[in-house]
From Swiss-Prot:
Main function: Catalyzes the cyclization of farnesyl diphosphate (FPP) to 10-epi-cubebol. Is also responsible for the formation of many other sesquiterpenes, mainly cadalanes and cubebanes, including 1,10-di-epi-cubebol and the cadalanes delta-cadinene, T-cadinol and alpha-cadinol.
EC number, as in UniProt: 4.2.3.175
Binding-site residues, Mg(2+) 2: D79
Database matches in InterPro entries: Isoprenoid_synthase_dom_sf, Terpene_cyclase-like_2
Organism for this UniProt entry: Sorangium cellulosum (strain So ce56)
Protein name: 10-epi-cubebol synthase
GO molecular function: metal ion binding; terpene synthase activity
Length: 315
């Protein structure tokens, strides 16, 4: 069942300050009260989140990478809380209440005070990320985070109703619940190459972004399958295929891998035909697309080794 996924992109080299990043991020996570415990397993997970960020943005200015890395840690812990809250029987309105304060941080000028520590931690990240970044980029990032929040509520509703979404609905929502669009936004932030809306919304560029999202999202579903099936979570491409096509796990896994690989081929074809704008934008767009390639490969390699997915009882 573990056939290799297609990943024709070169292996990445981590940021030269990766070790310092890991130490700083762990200290920030501890200071903000995000750690559920101080077990070696939990600490290893935090270090693995830092390793992912260091490989995904190897050329970033360190302070910007710090903000990205802290967001990664925030996101992984927050995602687990939302998932575990609804899996343990809480109604979607409980998840919505948790998310409400986070939503307020995105829109408000000051830190929200409810549901600490997540709102306070995000407010700290948000203040740092906002410095010196153009308004159109901040609005885009906010929209993508809000779409993720809406996706968390949708998942909670599905769990309450014991509902497995159709493949079509799932794939559409997966583009938001995976948070990949935020990670693509961080490529701009890390490289100081902010692309105007008319560039990222160009149909061909938008399809490059969507295809890259699908590659990373479906790879995540495959690599996290053990974690999610142990949690009885249905929001996974393999599980959706099992349910919709009435096939066994092995066949669904192979189907999901094939869907992933087809998106890789589609992405490779798309990037041969990028539109042109101006000399500066064209250079930045090329760097942006290269950043997506780097991210996909870094995530592929990280997913194989991270304790988040690869412990015997990965949860």
């Amino acid at each position: 069942m573990h056939r290799a996924l297609l990943c024709p992109f070169p292996a990445t080299t981590p940021h030269p300050q990766a070790a310092q990043l890991a130490n700083d991020c762990l200290e920030w996570t501890r200071k903000c009260g995000l750690l559920p415990d101080e077990s070696p397993r939990t600490l290893d997970k935090v270090r693995s989140y830092s390793a992912l960020a260091a490989h995904c943005y190897p050329d970033a200015h360190f302070e910007r990478l710090r903000a990205i890395c802290d967001y990664y840690s925030w996101l992984f812990f927050f995602d687990d809380v939302c998932e575990n809250t609804s899996l343990n029987g809480a109604e979607p309105k409980v998840v919505s209440s948790l998310l409400f304060d986070v939503y307020g941080v995105l829109r408000g000028p000051t830190a929200a005070v409810g549901h600490a520590p997540f709102a306070q931690a995000l407010a700290d990240i948000w203040r740092r990320i906002g410095d010196g970044c153009p308004g159109f980029w901040r609005r885009r990032l906010i929209r993508h985070v809000e779409n993720y929040i809406d996706g968390c509520v949708w998942e909670a509703q599905n769990r309450q109703l014991d509902r497995v979404p159709s493949r079509a609905v799932f794939e559409g929502m997966r583009m938001h619940t995976s948070t990949m669009y935020e990670f693509w936004d961080f490529i701009e932030y890390a490289g100081d190459l902010f692309l105007p809306d008319e560039v990222v919304e160009h149909p061909l560029v938008a399809e490059v972004r969507r295809a890259g999202n699908a590659i990373a999202s479906f790879a995540n579903d495959i690599y996290s399958l053990r974690k999610e099936t142990s949690n009885r979570d249905v929001h996974n491409l393999v599980v959706v295929l099992m349910h919709e096509e009435r096939i066994e796990l092995e066949a669904a896994y192979a189907r999901a891998a094939g869907i992933h690989d087809a998106q890789v081929e589609h992405f490779l074809d798309l990037v041969k035909h990028l539109p042109t704008f101006s000399a500066t934008i064209d250079r930045n767009l090329a760097r942006y697309v290269e950043g997506i390639r780097i991210w996909i490969r870094a995530n592929h390699d990280w997913s194989i080794v991270t304790p988040r997915y690869n412990e015997p009882d990965a949860r």
